[in-house]
Regions:
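Helix-to-loop junction immediately C-terminal to a conserved catalytic motif
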Residues: 53
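Conserved ABC transporter NBD signature motif
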Residues: 61-69, 78
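Conserved ABC ATPase "signature" region
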Residues: 102, 117-137
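Conserved ABC ATPase signature
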Residues: 113-114, 139-143, 147
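Conserved catalytic motifs of ABC-family nucleotide-binding domains
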Residues: 160
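Catalytic Walker B motif of ABC-type/P-loop ATPase nucleotide-binding domains
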Residues: 164-168
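ABC ATPase nucleotide-binding domains
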Residues: 241-318, 337-339, 345-347, 362-382
Length: 382
Protein backbone atom coordinates (compact mmCIF):
# COMPACT_ATOMS: atom_id res chain seq x y z
CA UNK A 1 0.00 0.00 0.00
CA UNK A 2 1.27 3.50 -0.85
CA UNK A 3 2.74 4.99 2.33
CA UNK A 4 1.06 8.33 1.61
CA UNK A 5 -2.41 6.77 1.59
CA UNK A 6 -4.06 7.06 5.01
CA UNK A 7 -7.38 5.49 4.04
CA UNK A 8 -8.81 3.88 0.93
CA UNK A 9 -12.37 3.02 -0.05
CA UNK A 10 -13.16 0.47 -2.73
CA UNK A 11 -16.67 0.40 -4.27
CA UNK A 12 -18.00 1.68 -0.95
CA UNK A 13 -21.78 1.91 -0.52
CA UNK A 14 -23.18 3.86 2.43
CA UNK A 15 -26.61 4.27 3.95
CA UNK A 16 -28.90 3.28 6.81
CA UNK A 17 -30.10 -0.26 7.48
CA UNK A 18 -30.97 -1.61 4.02
CA UNK A 19 -31.29 1.76 2.26
CA UNK A 20 -28.28 2.73 0.15
CA UNK A 21 -27.77 6.50 0.00
CA UNK A 22 -24.56 6.61 -2.04
CA UNK A 23 -22.73 3.85 -3.90
CA UNK A 24 -19.50 3.07 -5.75
CA UNK A 25 -17.24 5.42 -3.78
CA UNK A 26 -13.56 5.07 -4.65
CA UNK A 27 -11.31 7.30 -2.54
CA UNK A 28 -7.61 7.44 -1.75
CA UNK A 29 -7.15 9.71 1.25
CA UNK A 30 -3.56 10.94 1.34
CA UNK A 31 -1.37 12.53 4.00
CA UNK A 32 -1.46 16.31 4.02
CA UNK A 33 -4.27 16.52 1.47
CA UNK A 34 -7.79 17.93 1.80
CA UNK A 35 -10.77 16.19 0.21
CA UNK A 36 -14.12 17.94 0.01
CA UNK A 37 -17.52 16.35 -0.63
CA UNK A 38 -19.90 18.67 -2.48
CA UNK A 39 -23.53 18.08 -3.33
CA UNK A 40 -27.11 19.05 -2.51
CA UNK A 41 -28.77 18.32 0.83
CA UNK A 42 -29.60 14.66 1.21
CA UNK A 43 -26.96 13.52 -1.28
CA UNK A 44 -25.16 11.41 1.32
CA UNK A 45 -22.15 13.54 2.25
CA UNK A 46 -22.66 13.20 6.01
CA UNK A 47 -23.41 9.51 5.62
CA UNK A 48 -20.03 9.01 3.95
CA UNK A 49 -18.27 10.77 6.83
CA UNK A 50 -20.16 8.73 9.43
CA UNK A 51 -19.13 5.56 7.62
CA UNK A 52 -15.47 6.60 7.41
CA UNK A 53 -15.63 7.34 11.15
CA UNK A 54 -17.13 3.88 11.73
CA UNK A 55 -20.27 5.38 13.21
CA UNK A 56 -22.13 3.52 10.46
CA UNK A 57 -21.26 0.18 8.90
CA UNK A 58 -20.69 0.05 5.14
CA UNK A 59 -23.53 -1.45 3.12
CA UNK A 60 -21.09 -2.64 0.50
CA UNK A 61 -17.47 -2.40 -0.55
CA UNK A 62 -14.67 -1.74 1.87
CA UNK A 63 -12.86 0.90 3.94
CA UNK A 64 -9.19 0.14 4.50
CA UNK A 65 -6.76 1.95 6.79
CA UNK A 66 -3.09 1.01 6.90
CA UNK A 67 -3.86 -2.21 5.05
CA UNK A 68 -6.56 -3.27 7.52
CA UNK A 69 -10.32 -3.28 7.21
CA UNK A 70 -11.67 -0.42 9.31
CA UNK A 71 -14.05 -2.77 11.11
CA UNK A 72 -11.14 -4.84 12.47
CA UNK A 73 -9.36 -1.94 14.19
CA UNK A 74 -10.01 -1.68 17.94
CA UNK A 75 -11.90 1.43 19.08
CA UNK A 76 -9.04 2.69 21.26
CA UNK A 77 -6.56 2.32 18.42
CA UNK A 78 -8.92 3.95 15.93
CA UNK A 79 -9.33 6.97 18.22
CA UNK A 80 -5.59 7.60 17.82
CA UNK A 81 -5.90 7.52 14.04
CA UNK A 82 -9.15 9.39 13.28
CA UNK A 83 -10.66 12.54 14.79
CA UNK A 84 -14.23 13.55 14.02
CA UNK A 85 -15.80 17.03 14.09
CA UNK A 86 -19.52 16.82 13.37
CA UNK A 87 -22.10 19.59 13.06
CA UNK A 88 -24.56 20.18 15.86
CA UNK A 89 -22.16 19.31 18.67
CA UNK A 90 -23.38 21.16 21.76
CA UNK A 91 -20.41 21.91 23.98
CA UNK A 92 -20.77 21.48 27.76
CA UNK A 93 -21.31 25.04 28.93
CA UNK A 94 -19.63 24.74 32.32
CA UNK A 95 -16.49 23.14 30.91
CA UNK A 96 -13.50 25.36 30.17
CA UNK A 97 -11.85 25.36 26.78
CA UNK A 98 -8.72 23.67 28.16
CA UNK A 99 -10.80 20.97 29.82
CA UNK A 100 -12.71 20.30 26.62
CA UNK A 101 -9.58 20.07 24.48
CA UNK A 102 -8.01 17.80 27.11
CA UNK A 103 -10.80 15.29 26.43
CA UNK A 104 -9.13 14.68 23.09
CA UNK A 105 -6.24 13.05 24.94
CA UNK A 106 -8.50 10.30 26.32
CA UNK A 107 -7.17 7.62 23.92
CA UNK A 108 -3.75 8.11 25.54
CA UNK A 109 -4.51 8.87 29.20
CA UNK A 110 -6.12 5.62 30.27
CA UNK A 111 -9.18 4.98 32.43
CA UNK A 112 -8.54 7.72 35.01
CA UNK A 113 -7.69 10.39 32.44
CA UNK A 114 -4.57 11.63 34.20
CA UNK A 115 -2.71 14.16 32.09
CA UNK A 116 1.07 14.05 31.91
CA UNK A 117 3.29 17.04 31.22
CA UNK A 118 3.45 15.86 27.60
CA UNK A 119 -0.35 15.89 27.41
CA UNK A 120 -0.43 19.41 28.82
CA UNK A 121 2.12 20.53 26.23
CA UNK A 122 0.08 19.00 23.40
CA UNK A 123 -3.09 20.69 24.64
CA UNK A 124 -1.37 24.06 24.73
CA UNK A 125 0.18 23.54 21.30
CA UNK A 126 -3.15 22.47 19.77
CA UNK A 127 -4.81 25.62 21.08
CA UNK A 128 -1.98 27.71 19.68
CA UNK A 129 -2.17 25.94 16.32
CA UNK A 130 -5.80 26.98 15.88
CA UNK A 131 -5.31 30.46 17.31
CA UNK A 132 -7.35 29.79 20.44
CA UNK A 133 -4.80 29.79 23.24
CA UNK A 134 -6.21 33.04 24.64
CA UNK A 135 -9.56 31.26 25.09
CA UNK A 136 -8.15 28.47 27.27
CA UNK A 137 -9.72 29.58 30.57
CA UNK A 138 -13.11 30.62 29.21
CA UNK A 139 -16.22 28.51 29.61
CA UNK A 140 -17.64 26.93 26.46
CA UNK A 141 -20.95 28.70 27.07
CA UNK A 142 -19.16 32.02 26.50
CA UNK A 143 -17.86 31.16 23.04
CA UNK A 144 -19.12 32.33 19.66
CA UNK A 145 -19.88 29.80 16.92
CA UNK A 146 -16.56 30.51 15.26
CA UNK A 147 -14.65 30.08 18.51
CA UNK A 148 -16.49 26.81 19.21
CA UNK A 149 -15.48 25.46 15.84
CA UNK A 150 -11.83 26.31 16.47
CA UNK A 151 -12.00 24.57 19.85
CA UNK A 152 -13.49 21.44 18.29
CA UNK A 153 -10.68 21.39 15.75
CA UNK A 154 -8.14 21.81 18.57
CA UNK A 155 -9.70 18.85 20.39
CA UNK A 156 -9.47 16.82 17.18
CA UNK A 157 -5.85 17.87 16.68
CA UNK A 158 -4.74 16.96 20.19
CA UNK A 159 -5.62 13.33 19.41
CA UNK A 160 -2.62 13.39 17.05
CA UNK A 161 -4.68 11.77 14.29
CA UNK A 162 -3.70 10.79 10.80
CA UNK A 163 -7.13 11.82 9.53
CA UNK A 164 -9.68 14.46 10.56
CA UNK A 165 -13.28 14.14 9.36
CA UNK A 166 -15.40 17.30 9.41
CA UNK A 167 -19.09 17.70 8.59
CA UNK A 168 -19.74 21.21 7.24
CA UNK A 169 -17.02 22.95 9.30
CA UNK A 170 -18.01 26.42 8.03
CA UNK A 171 -21.77 26.22 8.56
CA UNK A 172 -23.34 29.02 10.66
CA UNK A 173 -20.12 31.07 10.51
CA UNK A 174 -19.66 34.56 9.11
CA UNK A 175 -17.25 35.08 6.22
CA UNK A 176 -14.30 36.00 8.42
CA UNK A 177 -14.67 32.87 10.58
CA UNK A 178 -15.19 30.65 7.53
CA UNK A 179 -11.92 31.85 6.06
CA UNK A 180 -10.16 31.44 9.41
CA UNK A 181 -11.35 27.85 9.81
CA UNK A 182 -10.31 26.90 6.29
CA UNK A 183 -6.87 28.49 6.74
CA UNK A 184 -6.43 26.49 9.96
CA UNK A 185 -7.30 23.24 8.17
CA UNK A 186 -4.98 24.06 5.27
CA UNK A 187 -2.16 24.75 7.72
CA UNK A 188 -2.75 21.54 9.70
CA UNK A 189 -2.65 19.54 6.48
CA UNK A 190 0.50 21.25 5.23
CA UNK A 191 2.47 21.44 8.49
CA UNK A 192 1.31 18.30 10.31
CA UNK A 193 0.67 16.06 7.30
CA UNK A 194 -2.87 15.40 8.52
CA UNK A 195 -5.37 14.20 5.92
CA UNK A 196 -8.70 16.04 5.93
CA UNK A 197 -12.03 14.83 4.55
CA UNK A 198 -14.95 17.24 4.88
CA UNK A 199 -18.37 18.07 3.53
CA UNK A 200 -19.20 21.64 2.60
CA UNK A 201 -21.83 23.90 1.04
CA UNK A 202 -19.46 26.84 0.51
CA UNK A 203 -18.53 26.06 -3.08
CA UNK A 204 -16.07 28.91 -3.52
CA UNK A 205 -14.09 28.05 -0.38
CA UNK A 206 -14.17 24.34 -1.15
CA UNK A 207 -12.75 24.88 -4.61
CA UNK A 208 -10.04 27.26 -3.39
CA UNK A 209 -8.96 25.27 -0.34
CA UNK A 210 -9.27 21.60 -1.36
CA UNK A 211 -6.81 19.36 -3.18
CA UNK A 212 -9.52 16.94 -4.29
CA UNK A 213 -13.23 17.44 -4.92
CA UNK A 214 -15.94 14.76 -4.93
CA UNK A 215 -19.34 15.69 -6.39
CA UNK A 216 -22.27 13.57 -5.24
CA UNK A 217 -25.89 13.58 -6.41
CA UNK A 218 -28.79 11.15 -6.77
CA UNK A 219 -26.98 8.32 -5.04
CA UNK A 220 -23.82 8.45 -7.13
CA UNK A 221 -20.42 10.07 -7.37
CA UNK A 222 -20.78 12.11 -10.56
CA UNK A 223 -17.22 13.47 -10.65
CA UNK A 224 -14.01 13.33 -8.62
CA UNK A 225 -10.61 14.91 -9.09
CA UNK A 226 -8.70 18.13 -8.56
CA UNK A 227 -10.77 21.34 -8.67
CA UNK A 228 -9.36 22.13 -12.12
CA UNK A 229 -10.43 18.72 -13.39
CA UNK A 230 -13.89 18.70 -11.84
CA UNK A 231 -15.24 22.26 -11.83
CA UNK A 232 -16.07 22.74 -15.50
CA UNK A 233 -18.66 25.11 -17.04
CA UNK A 234 -22.17 24.07 -16.09
CA UNK A 235 -21.12 21.36 -13.62
CA UNK A 236 -22.12 23.23 -10.46
CA UNK A 237 -25.33 24.48 -12.10
CA UNK A 238 -26.27 20.87 -12.81
CA UNK A 239 -25.11 19.56 -9.42
CA UNK A 240 -27.43 21.91 -7.53
CA UNK A 241 -30.13 22.21 -10.23
CA UNK A 242 -29.67 25.98 -10.30
CA UNK A 243 -32.61 27.79 -11.88
CA UNK A 244 -32.49 31.48 -12.68
CA UNK A 245 -28.84 31.65 -11.70
CA UNK A 246 -25.46 30.25 -12.69
CA UNK A 247 -22.08 29.60 -11.11
CA UNK A 248 -18.98 31.20 -12.62
CA UNK A 249 -16.11 28.73 -12.43
CA UNK A 250 -13.48 31.45 -12.82
CA UNK A 251 -14.67 33.87 -10.14
CA UNK A 252 -16.47 31.46 -7.82
CA UNK A 253 -19.53 33.73 -7.85
CA UNK A 254 -23.18 32.82 -8.30
CA UNK A 255 -24.95 35.33 -10.53
CA UNK A 256 -28.71 35.74 -10.85
CA UNK A 257 -30.05 35.68 -14.40
CA UNK A 258 -31.80 38.70 -15.86
CA UNK A 259 -35.30 38.94 -17.29
CA UNK A 260 -36.30 37.60 -20.70
CA UNK A 261 -37.38 40.89 -22.32
CA UNK A 262 -34.73 43.03 -23.99
CA UNK A 263 -34.88 46.16 -21.85
CA UNK A 264 -31.41 47.60 -21.36
CA UNK A 265 -28.16 47.31 -23.31
CA UNK A 266 -24.99 48.30 -21.48
CA UNK A 267 -21.87 49.47 -23.25
CA UNK A 268 -18.95 48.85 -20.91
CA UNK A 269 -15.70 47.16 -20.01
CA UNK A 270 -13.01 46.95 -17.31
CA UNK A 271 -15.39 46.20 -14.45
CA UNK A 272 -17.54 49.30 -14.95
CA UNK A 273 -20.68 47.37 -15.96
CA UNK A 274 -21.04 44.43 -13.55
CA UNK A 275 -22.85 46.29 -10.77
CA UNK A 276 -25.14 47.92 -13.33
CA UNK A 277 -26.02 44.48 -14.71
CA UNK A 278 -26.82 43.20 -11.22
CA UNK A 279 -28.96 46.27 -10.49
CA UNK A 280 -30.92 45.63 -13.69
CA UNK A 281 -31.44 42.00 -12.68
CA UNK A 282 -32.85 43.11 -9.32
CA UNK A 283 -35.35 45.23 -11.25
CA UNK A 284 -36.31 42.22 -13.34
CA UNK A 285 -34.91 43.69 -16.56
CA UNK A 286 -33.47 41.76 -19.46
CA UNK A 287 -29.94 42.95 -20.20
CA UNK A 288 -27.47 43.01 -23.09
CA UNK A 289 -23.79 43.87 -22.94
CA UNK A 290 -20.75 44.67 -25.09
CA UNK A 291 -17.85 44.85 -25.76
CA UNK A 292 -15.18 43.33 -23.46
CA UNK A 293 -12.24 40.96 -23.53
CA UNK A 294 -12.85 37.41 -22.29
CA UNK A 295 -10.71 38.00 -19.17
CA UNK A 296 -12.66 41.12 -18.16
CA UNK A 297 -14.77 40.72 -15.02
CA UNK A 298 -17.65 42.32 -16.91
CA UNK A 299 -17.44 39.49 -19.43
CA UNK A 300 -17.83 36.90 -16.66
CA UNK A 301 -20.85 38.69 -15.23
CA UNK A 302 -22.40 39.11 -18.67
CA UNK A 303 -22.14 35.40 -19.44
CA UNK A 304 -24.38 34.67 -16.47
CA UNK A 305 -26.69 37.67 -16.58
CA UNK A 306 -27.20 38.85 -20.16
CA UNK A 307 -29.39 37.75 -23.03
CA UNK A 308 -26.92 39.09 -25.60
CA UNK A 309 -23.25 39.61 -24.82
CA UNK A 310 -20.41 40.50 -27.12
CA UNK A 311 -17.10 39.18 -25.83
CA UNK A 312 -13.81 39.11 -27.68
CA UNK A 313 -12.49 35.55 -27.58
CA UNK A 314 -9.83 36.04 -30.23
CA UNK A 315 -6.12 36.22 -29.42
CA UNK A 316 -5.84 39.76 -30.74
CA UNK A 317 -7.82 43.01 -30.38
CA UNK A 318 -11.60 42.83 -30.81
CA UNK A 319 -12.48 43.02 -34.52
CA UNK A 320 -14.58 45.89 -35.85
CA UNK A 321 -17.30 43.38 -36.71
CA UNK A 322 -17.83 42.63 -33.00
CA UNK A 323 -18.49 46.31 -32.29
CA UNK A 324 -20.88 46.44 -35.25
CA UNK A 325 -22.75 43.39 -33.94
CA UNK A 326 -23.06 44.99 -30.49
CA UNK A 327 -24.36 48.25 -31.97
CA UNK A 328 -26.94 46.39 -34.05
CA UNK A 329 -28.04 44.24 -31.10
CA UNK A 330 -28.50 47.35 -28.94
CA UNK A 331 -31.21 48.52 -31.36
CA UNK A 332 -33.37 45.66 -30.12
CA UNK A 333 -33.44 47.06 -26.57
CA UNK A 334 -35.58 49.83 -25.10
CA UNK A 335 -32.64 51.99 -24.00
CA UNK A 336 -28.86 52.03 -23.61
CA UNK A 337 -26.61 52.71 -20.61
CA UNK A 338 -23.09 54.11 -20.74
CA UNK A 339 -21.18 52.46 -17.87
CA UNK A 340 -18.40 55.04 -17.86
CA UNK A 341 -15.90 52.69 -19.44
CA UNK A 342 -12.28 53.76 -20.12
CA UNK A 343 -11.27 54.44 -23.69
CA UNK A 344 -8.94 51.56 -24.48
CA UNK A 345 -9.78 50.83 -28.11
CA UNK A 346 -9.34 54.09 -29.96
CA UNK A 347 -12.91 55.15 -29.34
CA UNK A 348 -14.56 52.18 -31.07
CA UNK A 349 -16.85 51.32 -28.14
CA UNK A 350 -17.93 54.95 -27.81
CA UNK A 351 -18.64 55.05 -31.54
CA UNK A 352 -20.81 51.92 -31.29
CA UNK A 353 -22.80 53.52 -28.47
CA UNK A 354 -23.13 56.79 -30.41
CA UNK A 355 -24.53 54.82 -33.33
CA UNK A 356 -27.37 53.63 -31.09
CA UNK A 357 -28.23 57.21 -30.20
CA UNK A 358 -28.20 58.23 -33.86
CA UNK A 359 -30.75 55.50 -34.54
CA UNK A 360 -33.11 57.03 -31.96
CA UNK A 361 -32.36 55.00 -28.83
CA UNK A 362 -32.31 56.70 -25.45
CA UNK A 363 -28.72 56.61 -24.17
CA UNK A 364 -28.20 57.26 -20.47
CA UNK A 365 -24.78 58.91 -20.44
CA UNK A 366 -22.33 58.55 -17.57
CA UNK A 367 -22.54 62.28 -16.91
CA UNK A 368 -26.23 61.93 -16.02
CA UNK A 369 -25.57 59.96 -12.84
CA UNK A 370 -22.92 60.02 -10.14
CA UNK A 371 -23.90 56.84 -8.32
CA UNK A 372 -25.56 53.52 -8.97
CA UNK A 373 -28.58 54.65 -6.97
CA UNK A 374 -29.03 57.69 -9.22
CA UNK A 375 -28.73 55.46 -12.28
CA UNK A 376 -31.38 53.09 -10.93
CA UNK A 377 -33.78 56.00 -10.42
CA UNK A 378 -33.23 57.07 -14.04
CA UNK A 379 -33.68 53.50 -15.28
CA UNK A 380 -37.00 53.15 -13.47
CA UNK A 381 -38.35 56.10 -15.46
CA UNK A 382 -37.55 54.61 -18.85
Amino acid sequence: MNQDIVMRTDALSVGYKDKTVLKDIFLSVRKGKMICLLGPNGAGKSTVLHTLARLLAPLGGSVVMEGRELATIRAGELAKKISVVLTGNDLPGLTTVSELVAMGRSPYTGFFGRLTSKDEELIEQSLRDVGAYDLRDRYCSELSDGEKQKIMIARALVQQPQLILLDEPTSHLDVSRKVEVMRILNRLAAEHGIAVVMSMHDIDLAVKCSDFIVLVKNGEVIAAGSPDEVIKPGVIDSLYDLRGASYDEQTGAVELAGGESRDMFIFGRAGTASNIMRAAVRLGYGVGFGVAESYDIDAHTAKAVCIDRFINISDGPAPDSLYDEAANAALGYRFVVDSGFPDADGGRLSAAMDESEKKGLRVIRRGEYSSLEELINIIKKQ
